[in-house]
A protein has these predicted regions:
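Positively charged n-region of N-terminal signal peptides that target proteins for export
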Residues: 1-4
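Hydrophobic h-region of N-terminal signal peptides that target proteins for export
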Residues: 10-17
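Short, surface-exposed binding/anchoring microloops in extracellular/periplasmic proteins
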Residues: 22-60
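A short, compositionally biased
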Residues: 35-36, 91-96
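A short, sequence-level motif marking secondary-structure junctions
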Residues: 55-58, 87-88, 111-113
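Intrinsically disordered, low-complexity Pro/Gly/Ser/Thr-rich segments with frequent PxxP/GP/PP motifs
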Residues: 62-93
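Elongated, acidic membrane-bridging lipid-handling scaffolds
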Residues: 77, 98-100
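Edge beta-strands of extracellular beta-sandwich domains
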Residues: 97, 104-113
Length: 113
């Protein structure tokens, strides 16, 4: 039984050691566009990554940019910013969760207040 427990523990530790690291770093902050807007900053941690889609608060915040969304390629160290607001006019977007769909998978980031 001890051997089985040890083998299982070793296997789990190996899985954690090889867990993938997100190809992007994400942060959020206030916008100079007004209190109703939140700004998302996405920075590449890898040589090249394509951002396909950004989903804020499981779709409860909407994209507030005037230009339509299109996928964007980021090289290592480059940062892309995007504005989001609440779904109703004048309602702010309090960013709690952001899911970013990339060419290297979907990555979810949590912001605990």
């Amino acid at each position: 039984m001890k051997k089985l427990t040890f083998a299982l523990s070793l296997g789990l530790m190996t899985c954690f050691a090889y867990a993938e690291k997100a190809p992007i770093r994400l942060s959020e902050g206030p916008s100079n566009a007004g209190r109703s807007y939140s700004k998302i900053y996405i920075t590449s941690n890898v040589d090249s990554v394509v951002i396909k889609k950004i989903l804020v608060n499981r779709g409860n915040c909407k994209d507030a940019e005037y230009r339509p969304w299109k996928p964007i390629r980021l090289n290592f160290g480059n940062t892309y910013t995007r504005l989001f607001t609440g779904k109703s006019p004048g309602v702010p977007c309090n960013v709690i969760e952001v899911a970013v769909d990339t060419n290297q998978g979907v990555w979810t980031f949590d912001f605990n207040p």
